[in-house]
A protein has these predicted regions:
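Short hydrophobic/aromatic beta-strand or adjacent loop that forms the aromatic wall/cage
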Residues: 57, 145-151
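Conserved beta-strand-loop-alpha-helix junction that forms the acyl-donor binding cleft
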Residues: 117-127, 144-147
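Active-site acidic-Proline motif in GNAT/NAT acetyltransferases
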Residues: 87-93, 121-123
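Conserved active-site alpha-helix within GNAT-family acetyltransferase domains
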Residues: 97, 122-140
Length: 155
């Protein structure tokens, strides 16, 4: 019997990889959004790449044995965590937390003392407990998509 080793790597998001980010977004277990719906929202591989290249949308990505399995992107100007997405097989391994931690550190280093994000208000949603467990708190506000706004304050 041989044990298979897997290689997990983290790196900054790259503009040239946005088609893969779009594809992964449609494969998440909850809140999957396909390419057509993203385009309706104004998010295309081209627009995403432009935001990365401008420096306004930094991101952290994770690969397992060279395959993209997750990412987290944030808005450098506002301090918003824009998206955290993982393939279902990457859930429960600490990868989501690691990606979020890296993105939070990057936005903190950019001068943000407060970060925010939109999250499902349904307690049955995985994201509901995930963010709260990590110290994110409800602001009592709802964003334009009907999601609850959570914030994280660096102390």
């Amino acid at each position: 019997m041989s044990l298979q080793k897997t290689s997990i790597t983290f790196s900054p998001g790259r503009a040239g990889d946005t088609p893969a980010y779009i594809a992964l977004r449609g494969k998440t277990r909850q809140n999957a959004i396909g390419q057509e719906r993203l385009a309706e929202l104004g998010i295309t591989a081209e627009s995403w790449a432009e935001m990365i290249e401008s420096g306004n949308l930094p991101g952290q990505v994770c690969h397992q044995d060279g395959q993209l399995i997750g990412y987290c992107f944030g808005d450098r100007e506002s301090g918003e965590i824009v998206v955290l997405a993982l393939l279902p097989e990457a859930e429960g391994l600490g990868i989501g937390k690691a990606l979020l931690d890296r993105m939070m550190a990057e936005l903190s280093a950019a001068g943000h003392a407060r970060l925010f994000l939109g999250c499902s208000s349904d307690p049955q949603s995985r994201s509901y407990g995930f963010y709260r467990h990590l110290g994110w708190k409800s602001t009592g506000e709802t964003d334009q998509y009907g999601d609850e706004v959570l914030e994280y304050l660096f102390t």
